[in-house]
C-alpha cells in the first residue's frame, strides 16, 4: 500500500478543526492543541497508557480523560500462574480538567484521591511512574515505582481521520522498547523489573472519536541478541487509506510495514437445529454462532510478507461494561510470538517465544 509520511512540523488541526495532514511519522511532529478542536467537547478523548513487562509479569497504568468520564487504571499480570487483576476507578465529567499534556515529550500528569494516586513524571532522558492504591484487590493494596529510560529513538506516530465526521480524528504515538527498572509491591510479594530484562511502551492518544468503534492492537518490546527490538501493529477504525500504524523497531530505528491482519481463531457459541427432525424426509437447518476463541493460537499475516507470526496466548485480560449508551468489550491477550519480521533493508529478524500482547476492543463511547 502507498503510505504518506509526515515530515514537517505544523499544527495538527486547521481553523475548522480538521486534520491538516493525515499519515504517519517517526516522531511527534504535529502540535496538538485541545482548544483547536471544533467537535462537541464530550467527544474529546485523551489518555496516557504505559505497559511495563518482563518475561514473568507486567504492570499497566492508565490516566484517561474521556470528557464525560475520567478513568484511572492499574493492572498487574503474572504470566507464571497465570493471573491478572485490574482496578479502574472512574470519575464523571472530567471535561479536560485532568490537563493531560499536549505533547508526549514534556509535561507531567497525576490523578487520584484519598484511596489511590497514579503519577507520570516526564524528564528529559527518563520517565518516572509512581502509583499506589489502598484497595486494589479487595482490601489488598498495591504500590510501585518504575523508571523508564528514554534513549533517542524513533517511534510510531499516526494521524487518522474519520470519513463520517470531518472534525473527528485520532492522533497517536507509540514509544516502544523503553528500558525499565523498578518494583511493584502486592500481597506480600515484590515484583522486580530488572535492568536488561524489562521494557515499557507508551500509548499516547489524543483525539475526537466517533461513537462506535472496534480496534485491533498488538505490541511487543524486548531484545534480540541484546539489540532493542519490538513492534506496533493495529487497525480497525478511521480512514486508514493514508497509512497504517504497523511498524518494527530495531536498534531504536523504525521500519514501516504495510497491512497486517490479526487471524483470531473462531469457535461455535451455540448449535441449533430447526425445521423438523433429521432423516430422509426431514428438513434440517443448522446455525452456528461463531465467536472469537481468544485462548487458542492466533496467526498474523501481512500484505508485504514482512510480518508473519504465530501467537500462543498465556492469559486474556478481558473486561466488559454495558450500561446502555456506553459499552466496552475488551480482550487484551498476552502471549508469545514466534516467526519472522523483515526490516527495511531486507534483514530477516527471527523471533521465538517473544513476549507481547494482541487485543480486540469494541467500544460504544
Spell out what each predicted region is:
Residues 1-365:
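Structured soluble/peripheral alpha/beta segments that form catalytic or ligand/cofactor-binding pockets
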Amino acid at each position: 500500500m502507498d503510505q504518506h509520511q509526515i515530515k514537517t512540523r505544523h499544527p495538527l488541526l486547521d481553523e475548522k478543526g480538521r486534520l491538516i495532514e493525515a499519515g504517519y511519522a517517526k516522531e511527534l511532529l504535529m502540535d496538538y492543541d485541545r482548544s483547536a478542536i471544533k467537535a462537541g467537547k464530550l467527544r474529546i478523548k485523551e489518555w496516557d497508557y504505559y505497559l511495563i513487562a518482563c518475561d514473568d509479569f507486567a504492570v499497566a497504568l492508565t490516566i484517561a480523560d474521556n470528557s464525560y468520564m475520567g478513568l484511572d487504571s492499574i493492572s498487574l499480570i503474572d504470566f507464571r500462574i497465570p493471573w491478572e487483576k485490574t482496578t479502574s476507578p472512574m470519575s464523571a465529567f472530567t471535561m479536560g480538567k485532568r490537563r493531560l499534556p499536549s505533547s508526549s515529550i514534556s509535561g507531567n500528569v497525576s490523578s487520584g484521591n484519598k484511596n489511590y494516586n497514579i503519577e507520570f513524571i516526564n524528564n528529559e532522558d527518563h520517565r518516572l511512574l509512581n502509583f499506589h492504591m489502598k484497595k486494589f484487590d479487595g482490601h489488598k493494596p498495591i504500590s510501585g515505582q518504575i523508571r523508564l529510560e528514554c534513549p533517542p529513538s524513533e517511534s510510531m506516530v499516526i494521524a487518522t481521520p474519520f470519513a463520517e465526521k470531518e472534525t473527528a480524528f485520532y492522533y497517536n504515538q507509540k514509544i516502544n522498547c523503553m528500558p525499565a527498572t523498578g518494583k511493584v509491591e502486592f500481597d506480600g510479594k515484590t515484583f522486580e523489573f530488572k535492568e536488561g530484562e524489562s521494557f515499557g511502551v507508551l500509548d499516547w492518544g489524543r483525539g475526537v472519536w466517533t461513537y462506535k468503534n472496534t480496534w485491533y492492537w498488538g505490541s511487543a518490546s524486548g531484545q534480540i541478541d541484546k539489540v532493542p527490538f519490538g513492534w506496533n501493529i493495529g487497525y480497525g477504525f478511521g480512514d486508514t487509506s493514508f497509512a497504517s500504524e504497523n511498524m518494527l523497531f530495531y536498534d531504536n530505528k523504525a521500519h514501516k510495514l504495510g497491512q497486517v491482519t490479526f487471524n483470531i481463531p473462531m469457535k461455535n457459541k451455540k448449535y441449533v437445529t430447526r425445521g423438523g427432525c433429521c432423516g430422509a424426509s426431514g428438513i434440517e437447518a443448522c446455525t452456528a454462532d461463531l465467536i472469537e476463541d481468544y485462548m487458542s493460537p492466533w496467526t498474523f499475516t501481512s500484505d508485504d510478507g514482512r510480518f508473519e507470526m504465530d501467537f500462543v496466548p498465556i492469559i486474556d485480560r478481558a473486561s466488559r461494561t454495558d450500561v446502555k449508551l456506553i459499552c466496552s468489550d475488551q480482550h487484551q491477550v498476552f502471549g508469545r510470538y514466534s516467526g519472522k519480521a523483515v526490516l527495511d533493508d531486507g534483514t530477516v529478524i527471527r523471533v521465538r517465544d517473544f513476549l507481547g500482547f494482541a487485543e480486540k476492543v469494541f467500544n460504544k463511547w
